[in-house]
């Protein structure tokens, strides 16, 4: 496992606070949303993978905005039978 430093990541992210936000969003995408890592996982945890991607310049805020903009699932429309249950009288 290669050591990743904050200074290496700051070449691609404006400041440490943005690094935390971008890194956590990307780690969450990898861990829970099924997004594929852009680097070989090498048995690393999602947070380390995210920082490695940032260190290599593969991830930035614009990339995250583009990958988060996925279509929203539509909810089922209420049927006539259940319409009375939606808005009960007071």
Swiss-Prot record:
One of its GO terms (biological process) is DNA-templated transcription. Its EC number is 2.7.7.6. The keyword NADP does not apply. It catalyses: RNA(n) + a ribonucleoside 5'-triphosphate = RNA(n+1) + diphosphate. GO terms for molecular function: DNA binding; DNA-directed RNA polymerase activity. It is an enzyme of class 2 (transferase). GO terms for cellular component: DNA-directed RNA polymerase complex. Transmembrane segments: none annotated. InterPro entries: DNA-dir_RNA_pol_omega, Pol_omega/Rpo6/RPB6, RPB6/omega-like_sf. It comes from the Bacteria. The keyword Manganese does not apply. Keywords: DNA-directed RNA polymerase, Nucleotidyltransferase, Transcription, Transferase. NCBIfam families: rpoZ. HAMAP family: RNApol_bact_RpoZ (MF_00366). The RNAP catalytic core consists of 2 alpha, 1 beta, 1 beta' and 1 omega subunit. When a sigma factor is associated with the core the holoenzyme is formed, which can initiate transcription. Belongs to the RNA polymerase subunit omega family. Promotes RNA polymerase assembly. Latches the N- and C-terminal regions of the beta' subunit thereby facilitating its interaction with the beta and alpha subunits. This is DNA-directed RNA polymerase subunit omega.
């Amino acid at each position: 496992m290669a050591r990743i430093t904050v200074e290496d990541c700051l070449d691609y992210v404006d400041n440490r606070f943005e690094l935390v936000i971008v890194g956590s969003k990307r780690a969450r995408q990898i861990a829970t949303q099924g997004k594929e890592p852009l680097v070989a996982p090498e048995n690393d945890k999602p947070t380390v993978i995210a920082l490695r991607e940032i260190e290599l310049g593969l991830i930035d805020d614009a990339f995250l905005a583009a990958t988060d903009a996925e279509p929203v699932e539509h909810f089922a429309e209420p049927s006539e039978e259940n319409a009375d249950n939606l808005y009960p009288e007071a």
